[in-house]
């Protein structure tokens, strides 16, 4: 394994890299715990908690691990408090940070590893959403980085004698990544690309250890395959249908790149792209950088190029690829620091301060909605932080109307995101159905036929006149308005839910569920 040249004389970034990283992990974990306890669940989080039970071998949107975790928390007595549900994901990111340090230290030195981990914690898509929300990205990225660490030991550490054990570890961590999110397939594809293109390490393709690791990794997909085989391969059809081309759209490509830069933060995203391109240019001549590059390139390229066909996708889809570039960025930053570049030090300071300010603004806005009071015009443009507002007032509104104890009553919503919010607010004892054409996992939680003849409360988040009577009129004997409930944030009205009482569910709503 080729290590970088020794740093020039001068004070290194960290006198004690291990202590500095420990401080970053402890501080970051403390901040995430505070945020988890004070800010409600997002749309995706509410949905995942709501459909996690009954426990299933797999789920419509993703492999099962990130659904099993909140189900286990609730079963073990953690209840439905946001902090209890989010805590495992916070701990996953603490582990991801430590693994990033170890990968960077093994390949490029302790200072590089520490700097890569610090920069990782200054990027919102990693430090905030991956680091503290109930999403499959948390366990995915932890196990991806663990796999890369095992591969680095097996392939790039000349002093390593236990290569077979590291290959087995890579297989186990890859299997856990497979249980987390479909992005894990890039671990196998990227490793294969590395072995094929590196002449010195191509010999591993003729040895049993990598193939045993592949078999273990693919075993992680067994629950996914079994569930999909019983449900007409719906997950693969759903995921595969997201990238259907519709001509050539350069602006969509620019929108995708802009979204990625925004989620990572532009002043970190640009250097990540620079070190990635540099590693691509060096190729197999620099095995350490090439290994990271081979695995990172898959998610970045595969989820960016389809945007040229008119589908920008979501900006966090490429994030697992960028994750693996942080050890490279740490190495480049350490080298510039050793050269005495003042711009690097100012850039690090700016990155830390800017991230702190952005986090403070977003967190306080999510909790209080203060920006609308300071700048009322912002309210007319929409507030994305309202997605973090729990619908806790819904339960009180239904209880005040004497509806929660009504036998056989169920709650319905016109979309999976609203159904998720309602289901999380009401708890597992109140059945919630998603009466829409694309209910996602809600289409498998309850069988509509079990509720025929029952009454329902239909919940609709709307700022104007609700279309619920027209939309569902032919499926119920009668639908009457129950008025509205105001969802409050920091004691002030923030959103409005229209409520309807629907009598006698007469026929199932047509779902696009195989």
What is each model feature region?
Residues 131-139:
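Short acidic/glycine- and proline-prone juxtamembrane loop motifs at membrane-interface regions
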């Amino acid at each position: 394994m080729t290590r970088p040249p020794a740093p020039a004389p001068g004070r290194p970034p960290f006198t004690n890299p291990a202590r500095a990283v420990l401080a970053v992990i402890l501080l970051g974990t403390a901040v995430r715990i505070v945020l988890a306890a004070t800010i409600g669940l997002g749309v995706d989080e509410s949905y995942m908690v709501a459909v996690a039970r009954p426990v299933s071998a797999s789920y419509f949107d993703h492999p099962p691990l990130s659904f099993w975790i909140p189900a286990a928390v609730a079963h073990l007595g953690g209840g439905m408090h946001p902090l209890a549900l989010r805590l495992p994901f916070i701990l996953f990111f603490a582990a991801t940070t430590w693994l990033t340090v170890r990968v960077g230290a093994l390949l490029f030195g302790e200072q590089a590893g520490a700097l890569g981990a610090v920069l990782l914690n200054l990027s919102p898509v990693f430090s905030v959403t991956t680091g503290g929300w109930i999403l499959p990205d948390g366990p995915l990225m932890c196990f991806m980085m663990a796999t890369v660490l095992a591969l680095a030991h097996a392939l790039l550490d000349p002093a390593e004698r236990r290569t077979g054990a590291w290959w087995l570890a890579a297989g186990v961590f890859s299997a856990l990544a497979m249980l987390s999110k479909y992005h894990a397939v890039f671990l196998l594809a990227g490793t294969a690309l590395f072995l094929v293109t590196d002449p010195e390490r191509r010999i591993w393709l003729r040895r049993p250890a990598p193939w045993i690791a592949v078999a273990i990794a693919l075993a992680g997909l067994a629950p996914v395959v079994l569930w999909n085989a019983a449900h007409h391969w719906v997950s693969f059809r759903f995921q595969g249908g997201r990238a259907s081309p519709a001509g050539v759209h350069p602006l969509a490509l620019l929108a995708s790149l802009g979204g990625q830069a925004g989620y990572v933060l532009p002043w970190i995203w640009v250097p990540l792209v620079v070190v990635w391109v540099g590693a691509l240019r060096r190729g197999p001549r620099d095995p350490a950088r090439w290994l990271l590059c081979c695995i990172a390139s898959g998610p970045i390229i595969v989820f960016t190029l389809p945007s040229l066909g008119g589908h920008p996708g979501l900006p966090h889809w490429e994030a697992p690829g960028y994750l693996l570039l942080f050890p490279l960025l740490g190495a480049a930053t350490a080298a510039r620091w050793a050269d005495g570049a003042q711009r690097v030090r100012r850039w690090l300071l700016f990155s830390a301060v800017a991230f702190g300010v952005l986090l403070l603004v977003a967190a306080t806005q999510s909790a209080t909605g203060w920006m609308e009071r300071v700048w009322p015009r912002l309210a007319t443009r929409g507030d994305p932080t309202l997605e973090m507002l729990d619908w806790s007032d819904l339960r009180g509104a239904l209880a005040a109307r004497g509806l929660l104890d009504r036998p056989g009553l169920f709650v319905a919503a016109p979309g999976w995101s609203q159904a998720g919010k309602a289901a999380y607010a009401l708890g597992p004892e109140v059945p919630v159905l998603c009466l829409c054409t694309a209910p996602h996992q809600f289409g498998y939680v309850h069988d509509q036929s079990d509720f025929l003849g029952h009454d329902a409360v239909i919940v609709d988040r709307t700022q104007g006149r609700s279309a619920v009577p027209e939309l569902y009129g032919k499926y119920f004997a009668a639908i009457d308005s129950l008025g509205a409930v105001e969802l409050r944030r920091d004691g002030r009205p923030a959103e409005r839910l229209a409520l309807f009482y629907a009598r006698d569910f007469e026929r199932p709503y047509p779902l696009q569920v195989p």
